[in-house]
Amino acid sequence: MSSSGGAPGASASSAPPAQEEGMTWWYRWLCRLSGVLGAVSCAISGLFNCITIHPLNIAAGVWMIMNAFILLLCEAPFCCQFIEFANTVAEKVDRLRSWQKAVFYCGMAVVPIVISLTLTTLLGNAIAFATGVLYGLSALGKKGDAISYARIQQQRQQADEEKLAETLEGEL
């Protein structure tokens, strides 16, 4: 019960870092939706992968089911309300920077593929890996367009040419 009393204060402190990174509300929801879909695909593929006698496929399937559980716990804690600490874990994950989430999610998705390279593991972990990629793209942030970049380069080039002309005139 004490964890539910501390949740509002913790969620208020975890909200500013996500907003400071410049993620829009729709991109944040896209990342969360991708995480939930990745968890579902990992769980289904992991169960399918466990129906075999090959031990590496079973290990990869168990890892994929664990990935599904962790993704749901981090991205959609309301799906794991039977676990007492689900909201606490989700709040701690929300405080992580986007690049940390990207490395974590991509790393989790690559391990079963390394264990057993099959079509089931590739397809099952594709959306989970895409979740990490989406968080990685948000870590890069919004970059300027090509036109603005070209203008800045042109201004720098003109400034360099003027400095070169001044130094040449000074030598003469």
From Swiss-Prot:
Residues 54-57, 124-125 are extracellular. It is found in: Cell membrane; Cytoplasmic vesicle, Secretory vesicle, Synaptic vesicle; Golgi apparatus; Vesicle. Its main location: membrane. InterPro entries: TVP18/Ca-channel_flower. It comes from the Eukaryota. In cancer cells, isoforms 1 and 3 isoforms (usually expressed in 'winner' cells) are up-regulated in cancer tissue whereas isoforms 2 and 4 isoform (usually expressed in 'loser' cells) are up-regulated in tissue adjacent to the cancer, suggesting they might be important for tumor growth. This is Calcium channel flower homolog.
